[in-house]
Amino acid sequence: MENEIITVACPTCGSAVIWGEQSPYRPFCSKRCQLIDLGEWANEEKRIASDATHSDSEEWSEVDDR
C-alpha cells in the first residue's frame, strides 16, 4: 500500500489533484486556485464557525505600561 496514489478534489474548482511532491499547490490544483481561496479568506467570505456569543475583543486586555 506504500505506492497507493491518493487523489483529492481541489477545494476551489473540484479538479482531481494527486497528493504528492508532483503537486506543489496541494490540496489545490494550481497557484490560481490557491490564490482564489486566499482571497476568499481575506475578504471574510470564508470563516471558521464558532459558538461564541461574545466579541473576541472582549477578551483583549490592555497593555501594561511599566
From Swiss-Prot:
Disulfide bonds: none
Cofactor: Zn(2+)
Cofactor note: Binds 1 zinc ion.
Gene Ontology MF terms: DNA topoisomerase type II (double strand cut, ATP-hydrolyzing) inhibitor activity; zinc ion binding
Parts of the chain that traverse the membrane: none
Family designation: Belongs to the DNA gyrase inhibitor YacG family.
Described purpose of this protein according to its UniProt entry: Inhibits all the catalytic activities of DNA gyrase by preventing its interaction with DNA. Acts by binding directly to the C-terminal domain of GyrB, which probably disrupts DNA binding by the gyrase.
Record note on quaternary structure: Interacts with GyrB.
Protein name (record): DNA gyrase inhibitor YacG
